[in-house]
Design a protein with these regions (language model features):
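Intrinsically disordered, low-complexity, positively charged segments
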Residues: 1-52
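Helix-rich terminal scaffold detector
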Residues: 1-18, 111-146
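Generic recognition of long tandem-repeat/solenoid scaffolds
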Residues: 38, 81, 110-113
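Short, exposed beta-strand/loop patches in secreted or surface proteins that constitute
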Residues: 38, 71, 102-104
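Short, well-ordered loop/turn sites that connect or cap secondary structure elements
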Residues: 54-56, 61
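Short glycine-/aliphatic-rich beta-strand segments at the starts of folded cytosolic domains
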Residues: 70-83
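Conserved, well-structured core segments that form or line functional sites
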Residues: 87-129
């Protein structure tokens, strides 16, 4: 079966108690794709070829009137940086930009997938960071300056 349209997000729907849920585990990078093949926890394979919309953690697709496929993002090891001030933020942004790393910026924190080279550069530059397991809601993006 190939899905061409997202039917919703499981976090925004409360009326799915009457359906059986199959779950497919995906990497956060997969959320940026419009064409994807997944295998559910019931060992069923499904294709996704989106005509519009974007995948998110919790995106679901009706298989039929009684069954739903839900995408669940695998938690990933990530570097989380909390800049101390604007100068620190500028230095960090410059460093990560030079490394061409996609990031997530939210609530004053910069998050990116764990990379030992990045970690070593942050340590060398005396920049504090934490390594955490995080389940992303959407794929990381490169900063769009257009």
């Amino acid at each position: 079966m190939i899905f061409t349209k997202i039917d919703g997000n499981i976090k925004e729907r409360e009326d799915l108690s009457h359906v059986h849920i199959e779950t497919a585990m995906v990497k956060s990078d997969d959320l940026a794709k419009s064409i994807l093949r997944v295998k559910s926890d019931h060992h069923n394979e499904y294709g996704i070829r989106l005509e519009e919309g974007k995948l998110e953690n919790g995106s679901f697709f009706f298989i039929d009137d009684h069954n739903v496929l839900v995408l669940n993002v695998i938690p990933e090891k990530m570097i989380v940086i909390t800049p101390k001030d604007m100068d620190d933020c500028g230095i960090i942004a410059h460093m990560l930009g030079n490394m061409h790393k996609p990031v997530k910026i939210k609530c004053g924190k910069i998050s990116l997938l764990y990379d030992s080279v990045v970690a070593k550069n942050l340590e060398k530059s005396d920049i504090d960071f934490k390594v955490e397991e995080i389940q992303l809601e959407e794929s990381l993006r490169y900063v769009d300056l257009s």
